[in-house]
């Protein structure tokens, strides 16, 4: 509009080119030629209309070009993973490797995406979670996302068992709170599932942080959001309860590490597996990694820790992510060190939720609020 106004003002404030006899001194008074003046005025109006139409055309054409040429943010594809809680909006079809039927999805912007790792035999755990801290229906899921900036989904692979898949489909239709991964759901393949999770999460959500959590912990979403909202100097940050420990090389023991000879006698610093956080820059690197290019150890938490050693990441140790009891500062509660999660999650989740300290205490401790 300023462009049009400028041209109109310029045209109307300057006089039309005068015939030469207007400027010649004469003893006679000459009347302006009315037909010539009208003709000149008409030409000015035509010029104004022409330039206005051209400007409008250029503006519309530019808008159409921008909309057609600008796709969504770069997305790393990951098999056939999909988010069941929303209708995926697509802007462009790609011939590709199958994610969402070859469609690039629009990534939702978030503070954090939290993937609750679950399995086909964990239906009772999911029921217990939905009756405690995890939202029990799609509307509640959306309200929690709006309140905290965190999106929560159960994350599960696929099974060759048709009955298990049919039962899962029923649960999906009822709750719509899953991310489905295009990988086999097997305990011995947890490192592969974890990598598939981060790739899928990065494809579906544009988050500042990506959280891996197990389905047997009690979590305070509000406090997790507060933790993630803290300012950090490092763009590559790895947050969790950090630990070291002896490498288990005895095949008869639970945490046996087949490639222990590559590690030595003691594990490097890494986060406990029940919950940890990776910043967006780290996950972007994992999403871009070629399949088969990352070493996989037997244990998922060790595998992630080894990848972190290969990157220039900052290890942020936060014990509120592994609190054995609910406290004014606890974010995640689980039975450390007895179990890698709650020892009896179906019962313990409900017991903890009935405790005011777990479910009703303020997001911030009183001393922090006063400050």
UniProtKB/Swiss-Prot annotation:
EC assignment: 2.4.1.-
Domain of life: Eukaryota
Gene Ontology molecular function: hexosyltransferase activity
Gene Ontology CC, one term: Golgi membrane
Subcellular location: Golgi apparatus membrane
Pfam families assigned to the protein according to its UniProt record, in alphabetical order: Galactosyl_T
Signal peptide limits: none
Segments crossing the lipid bilayer: 46-66
Entry cofactors: Mn(2+)
Top class in the EC scheme: transferase
Keywords of the record: Glycoprotein, Glycosyltransferase, Golgi apparatus, Manganese, Membrane, Signal-anchor, Transferase, Transmembrane, Transmembrane helix
Chain residue ranges for the region called Disordered: 1-36
Example GO biological process: protein glycosylation
Glycosylation sites: 291
Keyword Metal-binding: no
Bilayer disposition of the protein: Single-pass type II membrane protein
Composition-biased stretches (Low complexity): 11-36
Pathway: Protein modification; protein glycosylation
Gene3D superfamilies: 3.90.550.50
Similarity comment: family membership: Belongs to the glycosyltransferase 31 family.
Protein function: Beta-1,3-galactosyltransferase that transfers galactose from UDP-galactose to substrates with a terminal glycosyl residue.
Protein name: Probable beta-1,3-galactosyltransferase 12
Record lineage: Eukaryota, Viridiplantae, Streptophyta, Embryophyta, Tracheophyta
Gene: B3GALT12
């Amino acid at each position: 509009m300023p462009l049009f106004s400028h041209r109109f003002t310029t045209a109307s404030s300057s006089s039309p080119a005068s015939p030469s006899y207007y400027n010649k001194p004469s003893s006679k008074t000459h009347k302006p030629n009315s037909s010539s003046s009208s003709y000149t005025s008409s030409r000015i109006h035509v010029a104004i209309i022409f330039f206005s139409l051209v400007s409008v055309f250029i503006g519309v054409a530019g808008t159409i070009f921008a909309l057609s040429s600008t796709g969504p943010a770069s997305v790393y594809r990951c098999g056939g993973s999909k988010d069941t809680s929303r209708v995926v909006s697509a802007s462009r079809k790609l011939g590709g490797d199958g994610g969402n039927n070859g469609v690039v999805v629009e990534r939702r912007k978030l503070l954090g995406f939290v993937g609750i790792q679950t399995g086909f035999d964990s239906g009772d755990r999911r029921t217990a979670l939905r009756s405690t801290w995890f939202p029990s229906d799609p509307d509640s899921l959306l309200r929690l996302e709006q309140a905290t900036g965190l999106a929560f989904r159960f994350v599960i692979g696929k099974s060759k068992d048709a009955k298990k898949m049919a039962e899962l489909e029923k649960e999906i239709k009822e709750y719509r709170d899953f991310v489905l991964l295009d990988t086999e759901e097997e305990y011995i393949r947890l490192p592969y599932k974890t990598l598939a999770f981060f790739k899928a999460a990065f494809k579906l959500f544009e988050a500042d942080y990506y959280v891996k959590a197990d389905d047997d912990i009690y979590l305070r979403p509000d406090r997790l959001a507060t933790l993630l909202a803290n300012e950090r100097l490092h763009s590559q940050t790895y947050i969790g309860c950090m630990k070291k420990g002896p490498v288990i090389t005895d095949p008869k023991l639970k945490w046996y590490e087949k490639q222990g000879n590559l590690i030595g006698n003691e594990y490097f610093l890494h986060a406990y597996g029940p919950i940890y956080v990776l910043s967006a820059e780290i996950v972007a690197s994992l999403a871009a990694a070629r399949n088969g290019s990352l070493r996989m150890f037997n244990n998922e938490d060790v595998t992630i820790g080894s990848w972190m050693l290969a990157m220039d990441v900052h290890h942020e140790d936060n014990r509120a992510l592994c609190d054995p009891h609910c406290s004014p500062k606890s974010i995640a509660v689980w039975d450390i060190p007895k179990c890698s999660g709650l020892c009896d999650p179906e019962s313990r989740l409900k017991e903890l939720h009935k405790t005011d300290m777990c479910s009703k205490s303020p997001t911030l401790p009183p001393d922090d609020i006063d400050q």
